[in-house]
Amino acid sequence: MQENNVQILVLDFGSQYTQLIARRLREYGVYTEIVPYFEKLDSIKSKNPKGIILSGGPASVYEKDAYKPDSAIFTLGIPILGICYGMQLIAQHFGGRVIKADAQEFGKAVLEIMESSQDSKDSSCFAFQGASQGIQAPMTLSFDIFSHHKFPQMLTALLDLWEDSVQASHIFLTKQHIAEIRLEVKAALQSSQNIITATDKKDFLGFIGVEKNKIEMLFVASSVFRKGIGKALLKEALERYLKDYPYILVDCNEQNTQGLAFYKSLGFEKVGMSEKDSAGRDFPIVHLKVSKAILKKALERGTSDSVANAFVCESERVFLRPYTQADFAALHKIVSDKETMYAWGQGFSKKQSQEWLDKQLAHYQQYGFGIWAIIEKQSGAIIGNAGLNHTEISLKGKTQKIVEIGYLLHRDFWGKGYGSEVARMCVKYGFETLGLEEVYCLIKEDNTASIKVAKRLEMQKVGEYPKPYKGKKISHLVFRLEKKVWQESKNNATQGFKSCSLFKGIKQDSIVWMSHADKVESIPQGFRELAKSGNTHYCAIADSKRKIYALQFHPEVVHSECGGQMLQNFAVGICGANTCWNMRHFAQNEIEKLRRIVYGGKAHCENPMSFMQIQEAFKHIGKAQTIQRLVEIWEEGARATHKDLSENEIAGMREEIREAILKSKNLLIAQKNEEWLGFIEIEKNEIAMLFVVPKAFRKGVGKALLKEAFMRYLGAFEVIKVNSLEWALGFYQALGFAKTGKKPIPAGSAGAFSPELIPLSIARESLQKSLGLEAQDSNEGVREKVRCAWATDKDEAARKLYEDYHDTEWGEPLHEDKKLFEHLVLEGFQAGLSWITILKKREAFRVAFDDFDPHIVANYDEDKIKELMRNEGIIRNRAKIEAAIINAKAFMAVQREFGSFDKYIWGFVGGKPIINAFESIADLPASTPLSDKIAKDLKKRGFKFVGTTTMYAMMQSIGMVNDHLTSCFKCNSSLGMQCDKILDFSQGTNTKSANLTKNPKNLHSHTANTRIVDSQHTESSDIKGQSHLESSADSGSAVSLRDFKSCEGATRGSYLEGNDRSGVANSLKITKETTSKVLCAVSGGVDSSVVAALLYRAIGENLIPVFVDTGLLRKGEREAVEKIFKENLKVPLITADASELFLSRLKGVLDPEIKRKIIGETFIEVFEKEAKKHNTKGEIKFLAQGTLYPDVIESVSVKGPSKTIKSHHNVGGLPEWMKFELIEPLRELFKDEVRALGRELGMPESMLMRHPFPGPGLAIRIMGEVNKADLDLLREADSIFIDELHKQSYYDKVWQAFCVLLNVRSVGVMGDNRTYDNTICVRAVEAIDGMTATFAHLPHDFLEGVSNRIINEVEGINRVVYDITSKPPGTIEWE
């Protein structure tokens, strides 16, 4: 199991703000932990983090006895980032001066970045504006998220921009139309959460609104039409919101010709048409669609095409571009200025300026480069010249041709760092673009500013040269910079700020939270200033050589976009942290960890090696992350086996490997416990790549990969080939490969950096034998490819169709939405027919149904239906055609709800296929409870022709269930993918399964043979002692039990005990090696329920979950909890009803603290009594509780460790005999992460999103004495409030909501009668973590409705009030 390896370690003393840092980094997939400042160095080293963050709150570095981190952390050689207090600590430790502030101050300030990456563009997209010099100069756009709730004052400005835009582009609209549509746009702006605005720091230039994968709004001010604003907004939306969708949709008015042209220029294609707009107006709407890949390329091309003539290279503030004749006036203004040209001795005349310009234009033609114009981005003005020039010099008596860099700045721009900026760009261009090995710079002896620049670039003085000019020889110093030095320079001076890319992508003038507490007045030696902000003395400093960075930002800044970006830059860009952590990894790891704890340090089984195709990896972790991880596998191996490789060679080979991986089709990845161990790529009959991580060397991984590849691909060829590296010859020759006799392939043939390769080959039978894959009596032979019995036909063409389908599709996991829709439609058409009929007509179906694009199919009209009914190539059944159209609409509705149909349908099996081990067709069921469940849900959503048998067949065809028979060669191959859900049917099947051959109506028929799929999760499947295994599968859990005694026997991927599959059934019997049990108190809340579900997945019936009904629960609480545990979680909950006991002991008690104490003591008493029933032999060894990360770190003191944990998060006060060993599975998680874990475990959203509920229950929501009558009254009122919140969709928008019975009576009027009844207080708050909270600004009409319902429906209440107190000063609960 891949451990949750710490990537970033945050050292802190318990600041709640520091939690945000860990949470934000985990959002980026970077696993982050928080430990106290006083953590021992050995403990820190043992965690082996890739980076450390020193955070903390207001504790001064001067505070007496305050704990400080061990200073030895600065010697570990890993990057360190100090934030707030961490910055002060760093500054003081390295000799800087820190001044103590009189008082803490926090506020917002403008961030001014002093230096940023010279190698990367500004993170904002560039639009272009005309400039006086006749060029296109980029205007820097700022992008912000618009929220009407936060910025209501901006609404009018955006509406005015919209109106300006449509008046210019929608000339067909009348004033009445515009006024009408303006109201609709206003409503959309008020309700949408995904609106991005573009400004030039003064005015709004445009905005875009998206919903899932659809562009709902895109408008640009008429003054900046055709200047790239629309593309810039689209690019920003693609990066923020649309990047996870394969296709992007947009609707455009047919009469908006400018808009249609714009979208079509970006690759959008028409996929449908509506005669009316969404409001029913007679405006035809064109439905457009484009793939993400095409749009991304179009936007990149659009940017580069627009900029191609504008710049050669760029930095944060300027870009360089070739001069044109139109630039003469601007050029002459600079070179004619005597002060600017002091190094030349005089200014240029117009003739000299023209001659110089002609020379550069000629150089562009001759060399492709020369001296270029420096364009300041902000103004668009030419401010000088910079570039490279061919020249000849004599150095140490030897004449040589060189390329020199040079620049000239107008005097108004001296002393502002532009010299270093343009010099760095020229150096980079020379080395990276021109491929030079060295560059020179010739500087006059008295030009001290330029000499400083040369030294900053680490150029070395190599001599002097008298440079001729106008008949004179002017002495110049000669500086040289070698490429090797430039590359190896640790402080990356020539690359600008790349090594310290803390501010990469951060916009200049960003608004950030600042901490004006103790300030750094002077920075230590070796540090430099990175940014300024507000009135802090120093805002950001760094020592890039030691990789130590410090920020004065208040940790609250991590809430912001730029704060998150800085953290990501540090973790990923500087520390090289991987971003593969996710909740699934955590869940799987935690299950294994819990088993080891409970079962005496031993996990119940060693998970086998499994294999997945690269396409599956793309689906799980994304394309970029997959390729990065594969390249890392290659690089680790390369560095271990080729220690003589230079960094330059590694870098070159890395890119070649990346390209090869990108182009690969048949690439398999070996993994064990989610850890990637190696990969193999096959091209026809050739092994193209085979790489293994060093720690897996000589452990059979390479052979296992080759074995898997043989089973899947290579077994079809007579001869298998490979071009081997010299050092790998032994591996291949041991398997029987021999040299072909051909000459070795020279180094550099396959790629610029490819090494020499030796051609090898082997006969199929020989490799089959050496891999241990010889044919056995059990029909495992590869030679003849024994298939499932249904995959044949008397007709040769039909048999070939069946075989191809069986070998390449059937049972293979499918995740592409369009293909899933195809299968859904074809399964419906197949109903009542043989599957071979579908296979023969499939290509015709694809043409007829527009390649099964649901967006197109959903818009089919009567004419299209008639056209399809005339198509002889398909099955002409009107009901099924109409069903396909209906299903397309329902399919898109599912996509909108779940993000993709794939996510919805695979959610039924937790994202992993169910793999069965049937021996004959007679064992196969026609349907299962799971297919029943899917069919029922699809029908509820409006789908047609989705009966349970049809759905079972579809589950098989898309690989949700794998029913390849044990005799089939694909069974071994597929079993390598997952062992999580293999179930044992060897002990018997139900009557329905056993009698399939007697009842042909149950068969999903191909021809005379039967295509039937998926295992049944029923009681008849006899897995003794493991009924919870079926439960796990039924619940759709993404994390299923792996508690198999000999799990490796169930999958061919282990290779620890050969390839014997005879023990599949027996391998699934679990033996209980220990009687240790875990006691868990369940309250019905999110935390304890997740703990119980997680533990049950890990240890099954060794968990004792106890739910105590105190009688203080909300209406229907007990019934809801019991139902969820029984039906959703499949966890056998033990309920102890002690309601009467609790009420009797609370009688007459008024003081809230005494209430709490009584409830706590009574709970312990009941809990103890229930525990004793299950501990007769001392089996209970552990106590599980839902302690979260905030509970752990909030207990840490500034001055040292504290063993106390907040009592309301624990079962405190347990008797001595119950002092079990504590298990806290959630102690590394935050509340939102606990919910994410619950989703992975298949828990229902209704449970996960429940509001917090206090341990003492309703007792502290009744002011005064607690009795049954008041509890019933409060339950009714509270139930009404919660019900209304759900109805109006406010429930999920507030952190917590409830009613309080004040026990304050007041006079009221009901009809003609006066009343004197009780008062209910309604409370709702908004919060992030409950540390602070503000009252929810619920609409008055909503509150009025709640009040009316409570007063009318709850007898005894005649007044309702709303609590508008925030925290602080108040608390969320009343007692």
Swiss-Prot record:
Region (Insert-2), start-end ranges: 597-1071
Group of enzyme by EC: ligase
Domain Glutamine amidotransferase type-1: residue ranges: 7-119, 501-580
Any one Pfam family match given in the protein's UniProt record, by short name: Acetyltransf_3
Biased composition (Basic and acidic residues): 1014-1027
GO CC annotations on file: cytosol
Residues holding ATP: S1083, G1084, G1085, V1086, D1087, S1088, S1089
GO molecular function, one term: DNA-3-methyladenine glycosylase activity
Pathway terms, separated by semicolons: Purine metabolism; GMP biosynthesis; GMP from XMP (L-Gln route): step 1/1
Keyword annotations: ATP-binding, Glutamine amidotransferase, GMP biosynthesis, Ligase, Nucleotide-binding, Purine biosynthesis, Repeat
Region (Insert-1): 120-500
Domain GMPS ATP-PPase: from-to ranges: 1055-1250
PANTHER family for this protein: GMP SYNTHASE [GLUTAMINE-HYDROLYZING], GMP SYNTHASE-RELATED
Role according to the record: Catalyzes the synthesis of GMP from XMP.
Protein name: Probable GMP synthase [glutamine-hydrolyzing]
Species of origin: Helicobacter hepaticus (strain ATCC 51449 / 3B1)
Gene name in the database record: guaA
